[in-house]
Amino acid sequence: MIGVGVMSKENKTMSFEQIFQEVKQRFSGTDVSQITDHLAYQFNITGESAGSFYVEVKEGRLHIEPYEYYDRDAVFTCKADTLFKIIEGKTDPVLAFTLQKLKVDGDIGKALRLKEIIANRY
């Protein structure tokens, strides 16, 4: 598992593809069956390894793909290191938003449900 930040095990900056694969791997097997609402998020990664991917909860299943999602509920924009801190539970998404390390656009109520997905990953 790669630690916080965007450095690989070889201390090289991770590409967007590597960041995406790491996120997808960390959430494989996440149980979202109790989430009955449709949730669709787009994540825009900024900085040297910029790119976009989406996370969707649909019919109790989690989908993560390296594409933009145009009919999304919310868009999260942050650097990769902030994203990994949130995923690892080292930074609360609300705190990251308050500290302006995470930008959120769209339905804030549905955006807050991201915490449910993260909590079910463990």
Residue ranges and their predicted role:
Residues 2-122:
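Feature captures hydrophobic
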